[in-house]
Amino acid sequence: MYKTKCLREKLVLFLKIFFPILIYQFANYSASFVDTAMTGQYNTMDLAGVSMATSIWNPFFTFLTGIVSALVPIIGHHLGRGKKEEVASDFYQFIYLALGLSVVLLGMVLFLAPTILNHIGLEAAVAAVAVRYLWFLSIGIIPLLLFSVIRSLLDSLGLTKLSMYLMLLLLPLNSGFNYLLIYGAFGVPELGGAGAGLGTSLAYWVLLGISVLVLFKQEKLKALHLEKRILLNMDKIKEGVRLGLPIGGTVFAEVAVFSVVGLIMAKFSSLIIASHQSAMNFSSLMYAFPMSISSAMAIVVSYEVGAKRFDDAKTYIGLGRWTALIFAAFTLTFLYIFRGNVASLYGNDPKFIDLTARFLTYSLFFQLADTFAAPLQGILRGYKDTVIPFYLGLLGYWGVAIPVATLFDSLTDFGAYSYWIGLIISLIVSGALYRWRLTVIMKRFESLAKSKR
């Protein structure tokens, strides 16, 4: 990160940060995409099982990764104030925090997940696949969270290209392990859909090992003195939790409502479950665009706010939102034209392809709403405003999505589509609430700047 003097310099810096994050996010979401697509080609029953498992896994995992992502604005503010010597200490506190959170998530997966999956009316074969998938996936909890901390460090330092290169390793690793374990290639036991969970875990363990080597060999990081042993500092842990808990809670509120809808789909047929999850999976892949804008905004805004250059932060906000709209125009057009082709990536049954394509049509409205809402979340994190956005997200997602969806399901014959309509409306409401909050925060900082002149 560095100070910019004009709009052109800001645009160049923003794009330098954004594009590596975008590629990184695509690689990140590709793990779920590969699991779903390869399992779908194996058979629909296993796909339904993996779908149910990810509906339970995603909310809790994203909650914890949201907590450790608080490292980005913390380091951003240090750099903006010229306190680079504080970076290593905060990094190690978040490593300790990630290890503790890993134990929590592991316990939840091992003890709660089987109980939930066996009591929501799933077919026995589907529930069995889901439980085994989660058990295998839990092997990778520690490297998943530790890598999230390393990535947050690299991103906050503006080294997004380095984290991109690391994450690009995930796709071939995950695909290779999945091929071996799902289909039983080269004498490896055939595990079916559950093998996708083990494949992802093994891929992340390898990725973590490579990342640690890079961390201590990278010339640009040697000035941080990461090789020095830093003991646990509970004050910094508390600060990280104080800032990260609302971030994780906001992400959890959004992802959990999608997952609850996925679990509600258990009352429909295996075909509907598989089609719903396939469309939702591709929507998540497309979410990489607004999510990348959000992450880039958190980096640049936190840096400028830390340096008390509030007008510069405002300029970046405008650049980020326009970038989001431009990319949305391309992605929405692409998905509308090729929705049938996209559906065929997940299976070859004509009924499955037709139903998935219909769900993908609804996902166009998801992406439009996310284009507006997701960047706002990153901007607010850049201002270190996380508590109120958490409550706004809770209201927008849970106060709207399920009630509206249930109402549509009861009063119309839309069936499974009712729940997509509820989700779309909740995203629109949440975006409006975040926009209101940003207006309040920006006015507050503008008043603060004027009072100090």
Swiss-Prot record:
One Pfam family hit: MatE
Keywords from the UniProt entry: Antiport, Cell membrane, Ion transport, Membrane, Transmembrane, Transmembrane helix, Transport
Any GO BP annotation: monoatomic ion transport
Location(s) in or outside the cell: Cell membrane
GO cellular component: plasma membrane
Stretches that traverse the bilayer: 12-34, 54-76, 96-118, 128-150, 162-184, 194-216, 243-265, 285-307, 319-338, 358-380, 387-406, 416-438
Protein name: Probable multidrug resistance protein NorM
Source species: Streptococcus pneumoniae (strain ATCC BAA-255 / R6)
Name of the coding gene: norM
